[in-house]
Amino acid sequence: MLQNQTRKLRVLVVDDSSFMRMVIRSVLEKDPAIEVVGIAVDGMEGVEKALALKPDLITMDIEMPRLDGISALKQVMAKCPTRVLMVSTLTCEGAKATFDALDAGAIDYIPKNVTDSADAQRVFREELLRKVKGAASSIFGRPMTTSAPRAIIAPPRQVQPAPRPSQALAGKFHYVGIGASTGGPVALQEVLGRIPGNYPHGIVVAIHMPKAFTGPYAERLNSKCSLQIKEANDGDIIQPGVVLVAPGGRHMALARQGNSIVVRTLSTAECPQYIYIPSVDHMMTTLADATNGSALGVILTGMGSDGFKGMKHLKSKGGITIVQDEATSTIYGMPRACIEGGVADTVLPLTQIGSEIARLGG
């Protein structure tokens, strides 16, 4: 069990596929720290059992009869706020529905990529356990709020003094790198939505997503923000007011080419040392090198410690760093690693980060 976990994590599984119910249940019940307290075959039964059983976490399919997963999620969040992990298909339509679910309050998602392939089944099992345990770290750390992640406007926590006052950092960089994981899709929209379209610097983003999701996600952000936002392609040049999102399933590196900074996309085989894909560490490290430290690094909510090494390298080259605070992080892992590792110049609640990026870059 986790350090602060005093009992088993109680999970409700909601899925209309008997095969998926069996797979999810068998994976979770093999872990002694997890208890599957209920099974529901559609969204309506899922809402009923959520109210009756009050689980710590719900795994929720999206496409179901009687009541779909997003409608069920909205009812759960209205009646008994619970952490919900969406189980979605690896398609463009599945991606769009997943982002709707995240907007409605789901904390994360897992692609439904269970085929006859032994490798695919292994990846699904590992990803499911990793995300459920990541949710557990927040469940046993603090209570669930009644609002979706987008609406988290918690008062700033008392944070350690920043090593460098933010007023002294303005105008010290020409590029921005942002990394995130769990809770990141909604958090990133909040951050980018507060940066004006005429922002004078280029922005690169690495967020842990599968291949089929980053394109629709970039399109979604582009429709909601003033900045121009697109999925990055190999050879793209970083330009002012443009946000390049690392393509899912690959790593993004930055390299200097003459007077420009260009994108290089790499396969997982070319960067086997990274667990998370796309790697925030690799993006931040190469951004620091390509810009000789003339960059602002930002770490948002997410599990694990991806981004810490990259932020540390950026700081060693004179770069600037901002990290999301604990109170507004869906999962505090990535921010915690940076803060406790001493690589955060400034620690801010989510709703202040975008404005600070805009102010410093103005």
Curated annotation (Swiss-Prot):
GO cellular component terms given for this protein: cytoplasm
4-aspartylphosphate PTM sites in chain numbering: D61
Protein keywords: Chemotaxis, Cytoplasm, Hydrolase, Phosphoprotein
Domain Response regulatory residue range list: 10-127
GO MF, one annotated term: protein-glutamine glutaminase activity
Active site (catalytic residues): S181, H208, D306
Cross-referenced InterPro entries: CheB-like, CheB_C, CheY-like_superfamily, Sig_transdc_resp-reg_Me-estase, Sig_transdc_resp-reg_receiver
Domain CheB-type methylesterase: 163-357
Localization per record: Cytoplasm
Keyword Cytoplasm (UniProt): yes
EC number from the UniProt entry: 3.1.1.61, 3.5.1.44
Family per record: Belongs to the CheB family.
UniProt xrefs under NCBIfam families: PRK00742.1
Name of the molecule in the record: Protein-glutamate methylesterase/protein-glutamine glutaminase 1
Biological source species: Geobacter sulfurreducens (strain ATCC 51573 / DSM 12127 / PCA)
